[in-house]
Amino acid sequence: MALKIRLRQQGRKNHVVYRLVLADVESPRDGKYIELLGWYDPHSEQNYQLKSERIFYWLNQGAELTEKAGALVKQGAPGVYAELMAKKNARRAVVRQKRRAYRQRLAARRAEAAAK
């Protein structure tokens, strides 16, 4: 079961309010969700409230952010977003390092084969 943190549309005509929810990928946009993680009201002055501890917990459990939810988390909980990006960059650095080592071994084998 793949999980996503995404925005769920609520409210009335011409005054839409969004809930930041954790939901299964296959559930509809306004359908059933697992946990409410915050809300976003683009029409008011204090326009969002996020549960940053729960967002961080679910991201560590493997949930993914949608593009719009990621922008909201970046604005509302920059510490959580920075931690997420640091983990992502650390994983990328490990992969980069493994690729470099593999390419160096491959180049050494080719040089050895050409020398024979």
Curated annotation (Swiss-Prot):
According to the record, the segments passing through the membrane are: none
Q: Does the keyword Ribonucleoprotein apply?
A: yes
Superkingdom as given in the UniProt entry: Bacteria
Q: Which GO terms describe its biological process?
A: translation
Q: Which GO terms describe its molecular function?
A: structural constituent of ribosome
Keyword list (alphabetical) reads: Ribonucleoprotein, Ribosomal protein
**Which Pfam families is this protein grouped with?**
Ribosomal_S16
Give a GO cellular-component term: cytoplasm
What family is it from?
A: Belongs to the bacterial ribosomal protein bS16 family.
Alphabetical list of NCBIfam families matching this protein: PRK14522.1, S16
Q: Which PANTHER family match?
A: 30S RIBOSOMAL PROTEIN S16 (PTHR12919), SMALL RIBOSOMAL SUBUNIT PROTEIN BS16M (PTHR12919:SF20)
Q: What is this protein called?
A: Small ribosomal subunit protein bS16
Q: From what organism does this protein derive? A: Chlamydia muridarum (strain MoPn / Nigg)
